[in-house]
């Protein structure tokens, strides 16, 4: 099963995890309404636009952009929606971006203690168990961490049944 980032965040939020707030769009029609709502609810001044495809490395391929104002937002969303995003995890043709997540910016200018973490929950096909992989290093460059300092990536297995999600 592949989940888009926004779907994973929704599951986490339903289970009490604080998440970066945002809205998913598949066109430009609601962009002003969405950005105004995010500003009102979060106080954010900047936005992060994230292509929603089933592949990692979206930022490296140009599918994640930091936007500093509402005027720039429409231009960036327009450039990402409909693009074929090529990442290290796609074919050379890339994947068509049909949806974007417009999220509050959680990195604030001037913050010196900004820290990225990596967490992934996946099924280990060899053991048939759910595996939680995490690191205090990485996020965007987790592949590099795995290659250069694999000891910084921890793995735990769980017998817990993860929530089942039904979609119509």
Regions found by a protein language model. Give the residues of each.
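Structural motif
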Residues: 17, 23, 45-48, 63-64, ...
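Hydrophobic alpha-helical hairpins/lids featuring a short glycine-rich hinge
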Residues: 91-152
